[in-house]
Amino acid sequence: MQGAPLRHDWTREEAEVLYALPFPDLMFLAQATHRRHFDPTRLETASLLSIKTGGCPEDCGYCSQSAHYDTGLKATKLMDQDAVVATARRAKEAGADRFCMAAAWRNPKDRDLDQVCDMVSAVKDLGMETCVTLGMLTPPQAARLKQAGLDYYNHNVDTSPEFYDRIITTRTMQDRIDTLANVREAGIKVCCGGIIGMGEEVDDRLGMLVLLANLDAHPDSVPINMWNEVKGVPVNDTAERPDGIALARLIAVARIMMPRSVVRLSAGRQYMSDELQSLCLLAGANSIFIGDVLLTTANPQAERDADLLTRLGMTSSLSARSVAAVDENVSANA
């Protein structure tokens, strides 16, 4: 059952009404929506690898990889393809459904894109879904990635249009929207979400969801990131972690507004109790990253994730016998 047609005309006021519903009503509506489109007992698991770390020319105020800030992070060159494929193979053995590769660039140079395309093709040969995040893309670059077999491209809007300029000045929101359009036009699935806990208001979080839901096509994946603490960046001065109920409400609104999108409970899970993560899954989140490092910041250990899923009676490709391989895989490339 697919339910009502997807909407692309949400208003901020409608989002506010949903968010303010009595909590039991909001959770019921979100879970009912979730069940119309997904198996509520199934969780998608992905693995994330930084294939080129640090030295980014953008000034994103939350990011440890920006060259504008002294975060103590050493910039690296693009990883060797053999090392990337070996990491992907271990991630698959450990239970990952999808392998995501991230490079700290404003936009990829052609010679670098050639190497990334080769990586994508090689990972696809392992039988995994592929995702990359490389910064802004032109239409020809998106077409090259599609030809290489890329499944998903991640390019977040980060926050609401109103709060955006307080966080980033070197790339406009329209730059991001243009890249999303180029990716979609090339036939690649879109992964696009944002970050909460940077000092924005609830209205900004809802504004971000309205922006995403009103794109010409809903993102196929919507990652909701809680800001990971990073020393030396401007967001340190404004950051305020949302309480658990606020996070669950936001997940629920995302599920209702974008009913067929995968909603990923992404960065920041190490700050969440098992009970809060369970509440977010009940609200409609149905994907996580596995492994104990996300790019440059911490993530819950795989043993904890596997144990939680067992206690919840949920299933994923992550199994108790494979968690050691997950942690070994990610730690070797931290």
From Swiss-Prot:
Instruction: Give the Gene Ontology MF terms in alphabetical order.
Output: 2 iron, 2 sulfur cluster binding; 4 iron, 4 sulfur cluster binding; biotin synthase activity; iron ion binding
Cofactors = [4Fe-4S] cluster; [2Fe-2S] cluster
Residue numbers binding [2Fe-2S] cluster: 100, 131, 191, 264
Q: Which Gene3D superfamilies match?
A: Aldolase class I
One short Pfam name that applies is Radical_SAM
Positions of [4Fe-4S] cluster binding: 56, 60, 63
InterPro entries referenced in this protein's UniProt entry, alphabetically: Aldolase_TIM (IPR013785), BATS_dom (IPR010722), Biotin_synth/BioAB (IPR002684), Biotin_synthase (IPR024177), Elp3/MiaA/NifB-like_rSAM (IPR006638), rSAM (IPR007197)
One Gene Ontology BP term is: biotin biosynthetic process
Q: How is the cofactor bound here?
A: Binds 1 [4Fe-4S] cluster. The cluster is coordinated with 3 cysteines and an exchangeable S-adenosyl-L-methionine. Binds 1 [2Fe-2S] cluster. The cluster is coordinated with 3 cysteines and 1 arginine.
> In what residue span(s) does the Radical SAM core domain sit?
41-260
The UniProt entry, under PROSITE patterns, shows: RADICAL_SAM
EC number in record: 2.8.1.6
Swiss-Prot/TrEMBL keywords: 2Fe-2S, 4Fe-4S, Biotin biosynthesis, Iron, Iron-sulfur, Metal-binding, S-adenosyl-L-methionine, Transferase
Q: What class of enzyme is it?
A: transferase
This protein's source sits in the domain of life called: Bacteria
Subunit organization: Homodimer.
Q: What does this protein do?
A: Catalyzes the conversion of dethiobiotin (DTB) to biotin by the insertion of a sulfur atom into dethiobiotin via a radical-based mechanism.
Q: Could you say which protein family the record assigns here?
A: Belongs to the radical SAM superfamily. Biotin synthase family.
Q: What is this protein called in UniProt? A: Biotin synthase
Source species of the chain = Bradyrhizobium sp. (strain ORS 278)
